[in-house]
Structure formats: C-alpha cells, structure tokens
A protein has these predicted regions:
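Short acidic, S/G/P-rich loop/turn micro-motifs used as interaction or catalytic elements
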Residues: 14-23, 66-76, 99-102, 325-328
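Non-catalytic signal-transmission and effector/linker regions of two-component phosphorelay proteins
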Residues: 1-8
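Two-component/phosphorelay signaling modules centered on CheY-like receiver
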Residues: 15-45
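Conserved N-terminal alpha-helix of the aminotransferase class I/II PLP-enzyme fold
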Residues: 188-236
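Conserved PLP-enzyme active-site core in the AAT-like
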Residues: 45-48, 53-56, 78-82, 106, ...
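Short beta-alpha junction loops
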Residues: 14-16, 68-69, 95-102, 121-123, ...
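Non-catalytic terminal extensions of PLP-dependent enzymes
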Residues: 6, 25-28, 34, 46-63, ...
Length: 740
C-alpha cells in the first residue's frame, strides 16, 4: 500500500529538557526528514488525554524523558502511556533519553512501548532508520483488506477499459462542467470508482477476495458469525433479510413503529403481518412496545383473532423490532431473545440507529448480536445496521449481522440469492470501502474510545442545557432536554440513570416495564416551551418548526423536528465546538424572540421565500402558530390517530397488487372514511406509517388530514409532509384507495 510521508511526533512532559538532549533530538529529527518523514517538534504535554486524540495522523511517537528523571517524571510517563493506549493499542511508542534502562522504568510502561533510545549510543542515522521501519510497519497494518486493495489499484495507474464510462475521471476533464466535478471530488475518488471487472478487488456479490476478507474481519469486530456489507442503506438490508427468510402467507410479527422498508418487505413477500403496538407520549415521541406484547401467549391470541390466518397453529416466521427507536428508546434485546427463542423462527432487530452499542458497556445486553452472550437455541438472529448513521460510513453504508442459533444455521446459499436480488451489479466501491473502514475504526480500544467520547459529549451538552435553564431568572424561559428529571451526574453515564421505569414521569409514557428499556443518551431531544409530555399546551410556546428553520438558516441542521422539539444526534463525529455553537445559536434565538425582532431580520432567507411573515415579530409568529396548534389540539390528535389499530380489509400485498393493476381511485379527504388505502400513508413528523396498504381509513384519521390541510393553508412553510397524500389538478388532497 502506497502512502505519503510518515509523520513522527515528539513529546515530553512539562519538565524542561536539557540542552544536550535537545541537540540530540534535533539531529534525530533532521535524519528522519532526510528519510522523507515529517518529524514534529517536541510538544510539552500537559493533558495527555487531549494530546492522544491528536495523533491519528502520526505513525510513531517518541516520548522524551529528561535528564535525571525521578518518580514525578515517571508518573507523567505512566499517565502519558495510559492515555495513548486508551485510544490506540498499536501506535509505536519509543522512549528517548540519556541513560534509560529497563531497571529504571516502570513495568507498566515497558509493557506498552516498542523500544528505548539512548541519545549517545547508536548514531542518529541508525535510529532514524529504525523508527522509519517501525512507522512503516504500523501504517501498513492500518488499512483493512478491501481498502488496501482498492488504494493499491487506484495508485497503480492502470488504464481503464471497463465501465464506468468516465474512465477514472478523464471523461470529466473533456467538459467545463465535468472539470468542475473533477476538481470538487478529486482524483482518488474517481480513480477508485471501478466496476466488478477488477478481479483483484474481489466481488461484493459473491463475497470473494478482499471483500470477503474485510467482511470476515468486520464480523469479528462486531461479534457476529457472518457480516455482509450493503451499499444501498439499511432499507435494502432489511429487504435482503426478509426475502431470504419470508414467503407468501407467512405470519410475521412487526413493530408498528417500523421503517417503511419493512412494510415494503411485507408487500414484496406476501406475508401476513401481526403488529406489536408501541406506546407514545402526548409530545409526539414514540415509546416502547410493552413487555406484554412479546409474550408468546399474547402473540398466539393475536394469531387466533386474525381474519386472514387460516392455520392458527403455525409458528411466526420472523419478528422485526425497531432497535432503537428514532428517539432513542432501546430494548433489552437479551430478554426478548430469551422470551421468543423457538416461538419465532427468525429474530430480526432493525438496528439502523444502534451500530455503536457493541462497543460500550453502557449498552451490554441491549443489542442483538453479541458473541459474549449465550446463543439462542433455535431462532436465528439478524441485526441490520446503518454504519452511515452513527459510525463513519458514507451515506447508504449498511451491514447485515447474523448470529447462528445452537440448532439453526444461516443457509448462505439462500441468503446470497436474496442478496443478489437486491444488490446492484455496479456497486459504488467508495461505499464498500467506507463499510470496511468504519468497521476497522471500531476495532479494539479505539472503538470503545470513540463511543465513550460521543457519550461524554452528549452528557456535557445535556448538563449545559440544564445548567443554563437553572440560571434563568424566575419566570423566564429556556430550552430543555427530554430525559431523566435528575441532571446527569458528572463523569460517565450509568445504565441505571437511563433505564425507563414505571415510577418516572419525565418520559410521559403510560405503560413502561421496569428493566426492559433505556434511553440512549447520545440521542438528544431538545424541547421548546409550549407543550408537556402529557399533552398540555402552555399559554405561549415556540413550535419546533420555527426554531429548526431559524437554525438551518444559521448553519445548524438538525436530524428531526417535532411539534415542540428538535432531535440531534451525538455521533462519533460530533465535537465540542459543534455543540457549543448550537448552544450559542440557541442563546441568539432567545434574544431575538424576547425582543420580538421582525422575521425578516431574524430569518431573512425564510422571509424572502414567505413574505407574508416578513414584518411579523418572531415571538408573534410563534404565538400565532402555537395558538393554531392549541386550537386544533394537535398534540393529542397526532397521538390518538396511532393508538387504535385500523381494520384490516386486505393483505398489504393484495392492496399493492390493486395499485399496480390500476384497480384504484383517488379519493378526496372528505370522502375517505371507510375506504381501503392502497398506499402507505406516513406523516412527517414523526415518519411512522399511519396506514398500511389494505387498511380502512378511520374518521379520526380523516379529521387529522383535514387539520393538516387547514394548518398548511394558514401557515405556508410550516406544514408537515404526509407521504401517500396526493394532489389533484384542482388542488384537492387525495389518497389512492382500492376500488371496492
């Protein structure tokens, strides 16, 4: 693998380094530079933990031990070595001094270093070559198999006579617009954009060569028996799992709070769904499915009551559970596996939002695939994970994890037929490489350090929001964070702090089982004044859409907007600067709101797009929208529409077949009640399907759609989106329904 000049860092404690030793270091640095390495001048390290996190681009570290080092210096040395090894177990570490010997140095330090350099023994030339060799070995070991093969291929300079047609990027250089594209994305990305004709890279579709090696290495990292990279997101991973396991007429257990890809899989396979119903608070946050819903006896009762299941004795083929929910509710996966083992053939945990759980003890037992826990006896276990969501994969990077049961093994031939069905024969190799690298980043102590840092930053943000709120004068307002009533204690999070219990009220859920769920602290719901979790509106309020539009205009884009909340993710890429900038913008919004500054000043771009708001004060705009929400009782309406399961008139696959064969008609909202929908009807927010194809529209749902239409008419720019809701030529909102 080719690489640019190696970088060697020199560091020392806070005690001064003598003149002669400084001169020896300078000679060694000069020799390293002669060999092509970048030698960074000695850094005096006061905070070893912070320094350790700056070394990701370094190939080797030399720690300088001053003359006549005593116990105090050895204490600094111990702390330095511990800090390095806490984040990187492999980085070569050498000690440099005048008369260093193993007899003098602490044993815990000697265990962690590659060598000791005495300044006046070997020549600087020899020592430089030794360091260069160790640094090179380290860098050569860094790249996992597929990424190494891809970079080698891109660097070889081979002419491309295969697709893609841009031929390593040269086609772009034949056009002015194409040149802009080339300049933006760069040579490496375009040279590595190849097709499956390049045999030395292996085959994603057949899981051979370097691809297979990297998948096997990632499986070891994530504790799985098998792991497969997927390049079209976890939507595709879910469909692969389903098409490998589910057939027409199979009984399937599905979290009603599932991603739409699961509902698409139901339509594709012709399965008969039985839904497990989650709780929900009046602020619009989706809660957990009660423990009772997983009871095999309760599942059997639902099978008995289902009108489309003829043979009531059949075993459900698959369970799919959203783990975690969008808002961060995580289930006790170990308990669910024990409860349903043998009662369902396949246990599938959609962990699109939980790929990090394996790497920190806070989540022990809360993720599906775990080689440190007992296997299931009979039920095969899958987890589908979006490595692009919370880890470092590029968009669409996903993976499928499989854990065999004691008496049930994955049939790789059947699985790969489903994999082929849903995977492009022209996958994007940069996405494969990002799957490879994001898994490698989580390997060893580095993965734990990354997740611990994300948790720590999220906790610091939560503490900061709570502290600022506590410091506001009585009667003044500030933002909140949805979470335990007691502010997070200093230090790392404890599981018990984040477990949901029936005695707590902060979550707002009616039915909570002790020891069954927790809130993931890195998923932060920032709340605005105006609505409680019990659905009570305040006299005034700040709707979430106003705040999110303000923040977006000022460079802060959030993950999701609720009625009176914003959802933000503390991924492994979040920094102190980023979340402190968010807090600064929240302060600025508060100042503008309190002064009732005109919208055209507070949000000029939004005012240009929607001039009807330009001369309104920011507080006045919030008051008007809040009054409308309150008048329509929108919080309780948007909760109630999800509480009762609609009547099932057709199986989803049959309703979809009516759509594809043209046996549908587009029905206006006022005429919808009692009709059978042919499409998924999904309001955003929250993005949870309200109706599945084949279900009858209720009066309450019609009322909700009318209210949404009225709000959109009254407040253009602040309307939500309902997927599945169409618009006729005359502007009437319609839904595609099955002809009866």
């Amino acid at each position: 693998m080719q690489h640019s000049g190696l970088s060697v860092a020199f560091a020392a404690g806070t005690r001064p380094v003598g003149t002669e030793l400084t001169a020896s270091i300078a000679r060694l640095m000069a020799e390293l530079r002669e060999l092509g390495s970048a030698a960074v001048d000695v850094t005096s390290v006061a905070n070893p933990s912070a320094f350790a996190r700056t070394l990701n681009d370094k190939a080797l570290v030399v720690y300088v031990v001053p003359d006549a080092a005593g116990e105090a210096e050895h204490g600094d040395l111990r702390e330095f070595v511990r800090a390095i090894r806490a984040v990187n177990a492999e980085l070569p570490l050498f000690l440099f001094g005048e008369q260093l010997t193993a007899r003098q140095l602490p044993t815990e330090v000697l265990r962690e270093i590659e060598g000791v350099i005495n300044a006046y023994e070997d020549t600087p030339e020899f020592v430089a070559r030794t360091l260069q060799r160790e640094a090179t070995r380290y860098v050569e070991r860094l790249a996992p198999p597929f990424f190494r093969a891809l970079t080698n291929y891109a660097n070889d300079g081979a002419y491309s006579w295969h697709c893609p047609g841009h031929s390593g990027g040269t086609a772009f250089l034949k056009s002015p617009a194409g040149t802009l594209f080339h300049q933006f994305f760069g040579e490496n990305l375009l040279r590595s954009d190849v097709c499956n004709a390049v045999e030395e890279l292996g085959q994603l579709l057949d899981h051979t060569g370097p691809v297979a090696e990297s998948e096997a290495r990632a499986a070891e990292t994530f504790g799985a028996d098998h792991l497969y990279f997927v390049t079209n997101g976890t939507s595709t991973s879910n469909k692969i799992v389903w098409n490998s396991a589910v057939g027409p007429g199979d009984i399937v257990l599905v979290d009603r709070n599932c991603h739409k890809s699961i509902l698409h899989a139901i339509m594709l396979t012709g399965a008969i769904p039985i839904y497990l119903m989650p709780t929900r608070n009046r602020a619009g946050i989706i809660g957990p499915i009660p423990r009772s819903e997983f009871d095999p006896a309760e599942i059997r009762r639902k099978i008995e009551a289902h009108p489309f299941i003829a043979d009531k004795t059949r075993t459900p083929r698959i369970l799919t559970l959203t783990q975690s929910t969008y808002d961060g509710i995580v289930y006790n996966a170990a308990e669910i596996k024990r409860t349903l083992d043998g009662h369902v053939d396949v246990l599938h945990f959609d962990e699109a939002w939980l790929p990090h759980a394996r790497f920190h003890e806070l989540y022990r037992g809360m993720h599906a695939v775990d080689d440190r826990a007992e296997r299931t006896e009979r039920s095969l276990v899958y987890a589908t994970q979006s490595t692009h969501k919370l880890l470092a994969g590029l968009s669409q990077a996903s993976q499928i994890l499989v854990q065999n049961a004691e008496s049930s093994r994955l049939d790789t031939n059947i699985f790969n037929e489903a994999y082929l069905m849903h995977t492009s024969t022209s996958p994007q190799y940069a996405i494969i490489a990002s799957c490879d690298i994001s898994a490698e980043m989580m390997r060893g102590v580095g993965g734990h350090a990354l997740i611990e840092e994300a948790i720590t930053e999220a906790m610091e943000f939560r503490r900061a929001i709570i502290r600022i709120g506590d410091e506001q004068p009585e009667g003044d307002w500030w933002f909140g964070v949805w979470g335990p009533d007691t502010p997070p204690r200093e230090g790392l999070a404890e599981r018990s702090e984040w477990e949901l219990t029936s005695e707590q009220t902060w979550h707002g859920f009616d039915a909570v089982d002790d020891g069954f769920t927790m809130l993931d602290p890195i998923k932060v719901t920032l709340t605005t004044p105006g609505l409680s979790t019990s659905g009570e509106f305040g006299e005034s309020g700040i709707p979430g859409l106003v705040l999110s539009k303000y923040l977006a205009e000022h460079g802060v884009v959030v993950e999701k907007t609720g009625l009176y909340s914003l959802f933000i993710l503390f991924t492994i890429g979040v920094t102190k600067g980023r979340w402190n900038t968010l807090i600064a913008e929240l302060h600025r919004f508060k100042r503008l709101y309190d002064r009732d500054v005109e919208v055209r000043e507070a949000m000029p771009e939004f005012a240009d797009e929607h001039p009807q708001y330009a001369e309104l004060g920011l507080r006045e705009l919030c008051d008007r929208l809040h009054a409308a929400y309150r008048g329509f009782d929108i919080a309780n309406l948007t909760t109630d529409i999800y509480l009762d399961a609609p009547e099932v008139a057709l199986l989803p696959a049959d309703a979809w077949a009516a759509m594809t064969s043209g046996r549908i008609e587009h029905i206006a909202i006022d005429d919808l009640a009692g009709r059978v929908t042919a499409v998924l009807l999904t309001p955003y927010p929250p993005g949870i399907p309200l109706l599945v194809p084949g279900e009858r529209v209720t009066e309450r749902i019609v009322e909700y759609l009318r209210v949404e239409a009225e709000l959109a008419a009254q407040f253009p720019g602040f309307n939500g989106i309902t997927h599945g809701l169409g618009t006729a030529a005359d502007g009437t909102h319609t839904v595609a329904c099955v002809v009866e």
